[in-house]
Amino acid sequence: PTTTEEVQALLKRIGVDGVRYEEFFITSFDGDVLGLYDYLTEYENLDELNHLACLLSELDQSDLEKFEAVIDCGSHTSSVADLINLTQNLDCYEFYPDIENEEDLGRYFSEDLPIPDELKDYFDYEAYGRDVSINEGGHFAPGGYIVQTSGDFKEFYRDTKDIPAEHRVFSYPKLSIREQMAAYKEIIDGSSLEGYRKLSNKEREER
């Protein structure tokens, strides 16, 4: 998460002051959540990103690993809003850490089967794990196996109006009166110059 002051300082550093320039785009992302940045674009809303960052920072390690596994299979990743809702619906999933493949999965679930000890060396754990994965619709992600266990996925977040005030950080830099006057003068001078160029071009075309 970040703060309004940090956002203002960054915008001022790149010349986005809300007067001369208002638009910007994000060229890169950095963070510790595996795979998250594959689903973020250069035009994301800063308040939404910060809200997501705040929610992720509140997750314990096991839920964070579960979140990473879910997004690895591409579920609820079409927008930042989807990702925000996912952080609040992780109880709809079951995550099995260190289950890396079908054989691991088969061995894990076979513990509940009444397999005689003398037959365990002949049991096809990989085939059994494959059947379990197919039947459950599970996914092998970096770090473990993820499966959705509930369809009760709720939409807690719809749009930016749902962002708590304490998570809102976007604000243009605060300019002094002198800085504001200089910015407006630059805009006016630029508009006058552009108007003069258009007039000169029109006169040349008429001649």
Where in the sequence are the language-model features?
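Short, surface-exposed polybasic-aromatic patches that bind anionic ligands, especially phosphate groups
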Residues: 126-150, 157
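Mixed-charge (acidic/basic) macromolecular-recognition segments
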Residues: 3, 7-121, 150-174, 180
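Non-Sec secretion/translocation targeting segments of pathogen effectors
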Residues: 124, 178-207
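Intrinsically disordered, low-complexity segments enriched in small/polar residues
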Residues: 29, 91, 104, 123-126, 141-143, 170, 188, ...
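A broad, low-specificity signal marking well-ordered, structured residues that form hydrophobic/aromatic
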Residues: 24, 144, 205
